[in-house]
């Protein structure tokens, strides 16, 4: 019935796109009129639109004209005209949706439409990309259109000063990575002056590669942290003990499907015995699970996880003595990102690497809750429909599949499933050799560094026939986390006839494989070659070389097309269908032909864990011989079903984590908003006075209960607390002995004495100085209390799941206890602020507020595209002073770079001129 209705009325996506398509005709109606305008008249439209908005019109009212203006400006400035389907994509973004557009359909150009329209309000538009390079490239490229139309743009990248960030955020349009925007938000809530804040609100955001950022990054919070006590020696000790323990597999249970490992009863007894004999358990403790040994149990569990669940060259690599995580979705190194709760230190101990100290969280926010700060949020990607439910549930964004400008010519073959990995690899090698001989470029996708290097070794020794001769070794390139520095060169040649490229998951890479090769990269290499020979490059020389290369690349493209276009070969299915679709999407761009096929085996992780035994039994039943594969539509459906189950499980995990984080998020917003009010206020004396009154009320209520007799009062306790918190030595015992004295009168006397003492202390310095001291104390105290609160919440989150065994809902328990902890935070804030201001000796000096309020801050910062810490480029830290740069030798640059023309693009691929990038390092 549902299928019939869909045929009759069309899917909801088709209806939505059809509705928006009718509006495109109205936009197109302005094209001839605007084409006839002079440049000045076209630029004047921006001021006209702003004036109309001020008079009460809405963005929706001027959408048709604004989109038409951007299209015309783009034609004049970039020589690029928005297709009608791109107009539809732009409208989806404006209406807070997700535009699913295929590879090569021009998402970057589409973003200019809603960006310009929403920037007219003057509240700022943020365009989020996955790395600094793309942020710079897109800003400089599309910024030409914005500048032409009278709007300003800025770029937020790693290494900018506070002033540069402020200027970028005050632009009409700001480009940057999700990490930079998120960390700026956190840093803004750690500074002590409004003048130090850089962001100006969260109005409208367009997220490129939205599935990568809002789904893949959803379980990883952005964290700013500071160092704590060094326990590296204990990690090493526990690792040695656990390594010895797990030699006997009966000591632990390992659940691959749930990714869990726990000690068996025998294992618990054995490790307890070892720890006890080594003197690692607390004295007089009842055993390993005594409350006094909680920390030891935690170390044992993390060492167990490190040794059993985490595999070298799959989950992480060791590079330069450092353990670097690998993103399971992109295959990228995640330099700068560390596992929490001591797990990263446990892996470092396992590998004998330098153990970095643990860090205490100072401020954190999940990607989900950061982006939910925006009043309006939209996104673009090539693959979002498989996660449509999650986008709708969590972000309230619907996914719209935008039709391609040209019909997709790609053929997706059924999967081939073999019994063993060896048989599968043999079939893969034959397929690669066939493509190579026929001149068809092939991209081979693997799920890990380990797999890509294994396949590379097999290709190097594989023998095949070419031109009637026996040849050993298929020439190929490997692109994985180890060699990502060579990515631009490798991807540029991946579309050349006969090219073989092995790559770990290509998700989120922003790469566009062009059949025949990339003319830009070929030109760049030619320039480098000419300069290396000391030759001067003229405009005529470059134009001549470009024409020659265009002809050569056109010929090579024709050869690749004749061979069938780019062949994408998947060596395993990923847990997520979206990652598989991203790999497939690398071929068949802009109407080019292409082919994709997955080669699987019953020993692959996905099939082995979820369907391995059943599938192997079926193959035996049907008498599948060695080297034979089974291929069938029902098999594809069965694999897709397994993937859906995993996706649903992962979604439930993310959704569950979000429920817990929402509890923290409500508290975070309350604290950050209160902190903001404190910073913006020039006089907090009323708040300080109110806090002091509340503290006195609490003290009297606790020690002099309202319905108790005077004889039952804790007079001694109240006297001590008043002295320690208020700095007052009052005759409270004498007051309590008075006939008919009541708790209210006691409260009034203490309050009066406290007010008088506070007034006396104000005389020590001027009122203005006192206000400054109060503000400084209050901000420092709220930061201190918030850090401790986050630590308590982390501990609570780690143990709250055990409440489920007592038939209690862990989430409700967490909400209740988190609220109690928050109330304690507020009480401690009042008490400690009052104690500081009433007891600390005041000696005022003009404060020198540093840009960063805390030393030794660590940003857990991932660049999803390059995988490297963006603070470093080519091994040279960005943001060096002139003196520091002058102290660097020319040899600090990679070999040959010092001969680069100063006005040429920098070889590092940043998009900047050489003199503005690595050239600035040369004296």
UniProtKB/Swiss-Prot annotation:
Keyword tags: ATP-binding, Cell inner membrane, Cell membrane, Cytoplasm, Membrane, Metal-binding, Nucleotide-binding, Protein transport, Translocase, Translocation, Transport, Zinc
Protein name per the record: Protein translocase subunit SecA
The record's cofactor note says: May bind 1 zinc ion per subunit.
Source species taxonomy: Bacteria, Pseudomonadati, Pseudomonadota, Alphaproteobacteria, Caulobacterales
Q: Which organism is it from?
A: Caulobacter vibrioides (strain NA1000 / CB15N)
Q: How the protein assembles, per its UniProt entry?
A: Monomer and homodimer. Part of the essential Sec protein translocation apparatus which comprises SecA, SecYEG and auxiliary proteins SecDF-YajC and YidC.
Q: Name one GO cellular component term.
A: cytosol
Q: What does this protein do?
A: Part of the Sec protein translocase complex. Interacts with the SecYEG preprotein conducting channel. Has a central role in coupling the hydrolysis of ATP to the transfer of proteins into and across the cell membrane, serving both as a receptor for the preprotein-SecB complex and as an ATP-driven molecular motor driving the stepwise translocation of polypeptide chains across the membrane.
The record lists the catalysed reaction(s) as: ATP + H2O + cellular proteinSide 1 = ADP + phosphate + cellular proteinSide 2
